[in-house]
Amino acid sequence: MTVKTEAARGPLTYSRMRGMVAILIAFMKQRRMGLNDFIQKIANNSYACKHTEVQSILKISQPQEPELMNANPSPPPSPSQQINLGPSSNPHAKPSDFHFLKVIGKGSFGKVLLARHKAEEAFYAVKVLQKKAILKKKEEKHIMSERNVLLKNVKHPFLVGLHFSFQTADKLYFVLDYINGGELFYHLQRERCFLEPRARFYAAEIASALGYLHSLNIVYRDLKPENILLDSQGHIVLTDFGLCKENIEHNGTTSTFCGTPEYLAPEVLHKQPYDRTVDWWCLGAVLYEMLYGLPPFYSRNTAEMYDNILNKPLQLKPNITNSARHLLEGLLQKDRTKRLGAKDDFMEIRNHVFFSLINWDDLINKKITPPFNPNVSGPSDLRHFDPEFTEEPVPSSIGRSPDSILITASVKEAAEAFLGFSYAPPMDSFL
């Protein structure tokens, strides 16, 4: 496929050259934007496109006369039909670069697979999503939000990191850190509940991750044991950022009804504007579940559970310390304006007496020995994954990336619902 534009007319003037040079300088300063976005800018710049070398790079063709005998001429080609950049803008990330070994998770839109990079021999968790399923449920904004949030999380030890994202004609791929210590949900199911020191350790690491997200004006909105992983040493790793809301400042609110029923805050159920304190409510619900084995207002009947969340007083059994009781009462405060964290956000949680034994600097640097070690022998140790997933065959279509459908580097993204999805980290040797 090629870009169709007007043939170069007249000599390349100084002003035209300046236009092309300006684009190149901008690219060098903003390499994180990705090659496909850069190519799109060049393709849209009339001065640059008239330069012979640029035409050669883009494979720009000269305009052709329409077929005289065609009574029903085709409409002008869309951007998806105009530029061919080859198989990938990022040679380090396309489906055929990976051996897909096992299914390790499933969701509404696709699967998570253990994969080994053929060249690097590194192991990754690759989240593969079906575009049709996403578009059918009109969830493309959430997928792009997840991608955007992942790009901001790479420097925090308790948030899963994104290495690459790319797409084919029918699928989206997130190449993520491979975490194989199991979901917190999995361990809670096996042990029913945790002793208070273990619950405190996990709650502290979770709070640290949430506080970091809040510092970026991101509200997580979907904290639950299924989204909390343990790494091979036993530290928590927060994953699945599809429901995150960006650009929520300290006093900012949003109103989208979303989350998981057991962990919804009262203001969300009331369909009132809510703020980042919804995350502290969820932290309280998860801590309660770690200590007692079930979420605080749980009922098999969803309507009854919602009524409990809205109206039932919090009931705490006597087998926890006073500091744990006080923390749960503060986090599970139904009035968000009185909830722990409403004034000073993470600092209120950090300074609570329940966490007085936590050295937060040591925590963030992973100098505190986790209370539980998953004892995994290596990347191929899948003991902490549900056999329901790992025994499922890997779909053969997952690893296919024929050049005819791979669009990672194509400016076809400009005409698609997933504009800018593809990502590769900057490389010093790129230019």
Swiss-Prot record:
Entry keyword annotation includes Metal-binding: no
Uppermost EC category: transferase
Residue(s) carrying Phosphothreonine: 256, 369
Gene responsible for this protein: SGK1
Domain Protein kinase, residue spans: 98-355
SUPFAM superfamilies per record: Protein kinase-like (PK-like)
Regulation: Two specific sites, one in the kinase domain (Thr-256) and the other in the C-terminal regulatory region (Ser-422), need to be phosphorylated for its full activation. Phosphorylation at Ser-397 and Ser-401 are also essential for its activity. Activated by WNK1, WNK2, WNK3 and WNK4; which promote phosphorylation by mTORC2.
EC number of this enzyme: 2.7.11.1
Keywords noted in UniProt: Apoptosis, ATP-binding, Cell membrane, Cytoplasm, Disulfide bond, Endoplasmic reticulum, Kinase, Membrane, Mitochondrion, Nucleotide-binding, Nucleus, Phosphoprotein, Serine/threonine-protein kinase, Stress response, Transferase, Ubl conjugation
Source domain of life: Eukaryota
Motif Nuclear localization signal per record, residues: 131-141
Residue spans of biased composition, Polar residues class: 81-91
Post-translational modification, as annotated: Regulated by phosphorylation. Activated by phosphorylation on Ser-422 by mTORC2, transforming it into a substrate for PDPK1 which phosphorylates it on Thr-256. Phosphorylation on Ser-397 and Ser-401 are also essential for its activity. Phosphorylation on Ser-78 by MAPK7 is required for growth factor-induced cell cycle progression.
SMART domains cross-referenced by the UniProt entry: S_TK_X (SM00133), S_TKc (SM00220)
Record-given protein name: Serine/threonine-protein kinase Sgk1
One GO cellular component term: mitochondrion
Species classification: Eukaryota, Metazoa, Chordata, Craniata, Vertebrata
Annotated segments matching region Necessary for localization to the mitochondria: 1-60
Residues bearing PTM Phosphoserine: 74, 78, 397, 401, 422
GO molecular function: ATP binding; protein serine kinase activity; protein serine/threonine kinase activity
Domain AGC-kinase C-terminal: 356-431
Chain intervals for the UniProt region annotation (Disordered): 66-92
Subunit description: Homodimer; disulfide-linked. Forms a trimeric complex with FBXW7 and NOTCH1. Interacts with MAPK3/ERK1, MAPK1/ERK2, MAP2K1/MEK1, MAP2K2/MEK2, NEDD4, NEDD4L, MAPT/TAU, MAPK7, CREB1, SLC9A3R2/NHERF2 and KCNJ1/ROMK1. Associates with the mammalian target of rapamycin complex 2 (mTORC2) via an interaction with MAPKAP1/SIN1.
Major subcellular location class: cytoplasm
